[in-house]
Regions:
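Metalloprotease/metallohydrolase-associated module, dominated by Zn2+-dependent proteases
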Residues: 1-57, 74-132
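Active-site recognition of the HExxH zinc-binding catalytic motif
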Residues: 61-73
Length: 132
């Protein structure tokens, strides 16, 4: 399945709230590439930073950074949401996972299209991880 390269969600639902992604050109707020409001249901991304167009990767990074803020705020973790180091680390983990995940249709997986019988991959048996 395809990866998320050059994509961001135009909308989503988070904790029952519809979230819309919008692009702005706020030249007075240069250096701040995005902001979000769970109350308003918006993730706002800048198209320019000090007059220079934001790259696709920067825009994706900013989107997921703001999404982590919204996730934390929606579950009442306001202190963590204000911790930029924590937010950035969570963004790194989520974005890396989404960017590199190799997706398979669940029906293919269920029908043993990728069986562990042909590999040395770890598998789970009765709740205990075993390695062949």
């Amino acid at each position: 399945m395809s990866k998320i390269k050059n994509y961001i969600p135009k909308s989503c639902v988070l904790a029952g709230v519809d979230i819309l992604t919008v692009i702005t050109e706020n030249k007075q707020n240069a250096g701040n590439l995005g902001k979000s409001s769970i109350a308003n249901g918006v993730i706002q991304l800048q198209s320019l930073d000090y007059g220079i167009e934001i790259s696709n990767t920067q825009m994706q990074n900013t989107y997921f950074h703001e999404l982590v803020h919204q996730m934390l705020s929606s579950i009442g973790e306001l202190e963590l949401s204000e911790n930029e180091k924590f937010v950035q680390n969570m963004r790194n983990m989520i974005f890396e996972f989404l960017r590199t995940a190799d997706w398979i249709r669940l029906e293919e997986f269920k029908h043993n299209k990728f069986s562990d019988a042909d590999s040395n991959a770890p598998f789970i048996k009765e709740g205990i991880a075993e390695i062949k």
